[in-house]
């Protein structure tokens, strides 16, 4: 217990020091004035409610915060017709307020991680584990295309899948234990993911491979708290799917993991780590597209860092898009509002370089420009 607390204090101290030391040169007022209205585009946010009507908090997200996108969960979904009405309203309202398309994201991996499931009237789907064990790439592409069609018809345009964590640790509770890995062979994982992405693209759905640099080795769950993979990680195995898929140009976005590996960064978990994101993912593997964080409300982050400081550190590390799965905080507070305040302060004071923010916004804009699901859902 004492060791865990000491480690948490060290990590929190490292975050505070690194954010403070990032640079003290304030951005020019004119440049900040140009950036400020767009800083909400660095956010992908989950909300409460199943309709836009009488939902002031949701309207603020779309028209005041001006988020790049929203993410749907079971709490937002009743059935297919309601979901289509909701997404149609979301996309229309966002475009009316901002003139830009809205990312409408969901976790629809298949199997147990499937927000559009039988309970809401959709048919059952196969998990990554099911598909990997079957070993039929044509079946994987067909199943992904079927899931993608479900998303398209519901007005969803971004699936935060596939999982390309290599499942070589049978004791892993959050990936292997719930059927979220295609398998223990990294080349098989890459092949299955390639087919899965092809199916999604055929349905007009964007994807995100996850969880970089690998969550398949852990013995803990980053949803619940701090996860240290220093002694279990195998980068020679876990980075293979990324290396192969990124080189082929089939990846739309990469999602990070909140895992700590002192061999990559002795101070902070991957999402907050510049050596991991900017160093390994961007410099070594050559990724130039969008990097989206995993949920910043997860225990691995929220239990150790303030939401705003963590978001600033993630952006400094090379993350482009900050995922906040639940915007509602105790006391009628907004996680996205507090995060945006911290980002604005960091940009204004020069702690988050304006040039880096502009690059992130450009990558996000390029991703949004590829959306193919129209506001009028078929």
Q: Where are the regions a protein language model picked out?
A:
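A charged helix-plus-loop insertion that forms the helical arch/lid used to bind
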Residues: 121-135, 179-183
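Glycine-rich, aromatic-flanked loop segments that form ligand/cofactor-binding clefts
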Residues: 91-123, 140-167, 189-213
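Mid-to-C-terminal alpha-helical segments outside catalytic/metal-binding sites
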Residues: 347-377
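Bacterial N-terminal signal peptides
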Residues: 8-20
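Short glycine/serine-rich loop/turn segments
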Residues: 158-183, 203-207, 211-227
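N-terminal hydrophobic targeting/anchoring segments and the immediately downstream early-domain regions
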Residues: 24-118, 322-324, 366
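Structural recognition of the beta-strand scaffold that forms the well-ordered cores
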Residues: 41-46, 68-73, 102-106, 112, ...
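Second-shell residues forming the walls of enzyme active-site clefts
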Residues: 53-54, 78-95, 188-352
